[in-house]
Amino acid sequence: MTKSANTKRCIKIVVSVTLRLCYHAMENSLAIIGAGRVGRALGRRLRELAWKIGCVVTRREASARRAVRFIGAGKPCAGMTRQILASSVILIATPDDEIPGVAQQLARIGAEELRGKVVLHTSGALDSRVLDTAREHGAAVGSMHPLQSFSGVTVPSLEGKVFAVEGDARAVRVARQITRALGGSPVRITGGKKVLYHAAAAMAAGHVLAVEEAATQLLVSLGMRRSEAVRALLPLTRQVLENFERLGPRAAWTGPLSRGDYKVVKAHLEALRDSPEEFAEAYDALNGLAARVLAQGVAGMLAELKNVSVQRKPKTKVMGSNA
């Protein structure tokens, strides 16, 4: 190989590496709109991973400054500003009903500068169509939802957590890169079905919590201290979930309904007459759901449950959450 050829080859390598570094630096710059629990937590984790944090946008500068302090980097911005466009990735972490308006404002202030940007939102229920205004101006749009609860006090570990991603190809690619960098596992969801994914998450989190609290209140109504009731129920719940993971749903299913003991099921419903009506209604509905998703003879079990359902009289008693 001649000296000239070597020189050309070296120049190509240098140019290639330089372009990669520039591309990497550009891809790893992030603006955050909406600095609530999710926005702050993701911002902090990404800052720890050497992402360059640009604008952190909230309605008021004081809250933006607090968010920047929590994240450890960024420029506090009160309201939408063109400085957002200095970052290559724009993360919208506002409440769901504000996301379409944010996209419209981005289009208004960005216009042609949106071309080539990646705009992601973190809603669990909404898909990327709410960002169509930004898409029309050349941005690649998508959504990235971590299947994780955020307390706002500490930053949870995202290691092994599932992130639902969807949207344009480039936006999905960036969402996957972010997810993997955070230690998460990206799962692509069909945009039009995303709300069903969110319903599943709500059942597994919020509804399980409601059932656990209802059971706790029932034990408290019998004279247990709340701490005793929680201590009694949590190991039971944990064991069921561990069995669900290890053995599968049917093998983990316990209780009178799993054994076809309808007399006990009816006795439970009778005992719940003195509780607020939602308790017996939920117990009844959950029996039906268990029959539908766990029983082998679904029709027969549903028929038996219909026979033992208790017709309730209206009640006014209220069981407080701090009973």
List each language-model region with its residue ranges.
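Acidic, Ala/Val/Gly-enriched low-complexity intrinsically disordered segments
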Residues: A5, V14-V17, A25, V318, ...
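NAD(P)+-binding Rossmann beta1-loop-alpha1 motif at the extreme N-terminus of oxidoreductases
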Residues: Y23-R82
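Short, hydrophobic beta-strand segments that form beta-sheet elements in well-ordered domains
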Residues: C55-T58, V119-T122, F163-E166
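Internal alpha-helical scaffold of NAD(P)-dependent oxidoreductase catalytic cores
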Residues: R65-F70, A134, G138-A139, V155-R246
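Rossmann-like NAD(P)(H) cofactor-binding subdomain of soluble oxidoreductases
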Residues: I71-T154
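Interdomain hinge/lid region at the active-site interface
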Residues: V240-G300, V308
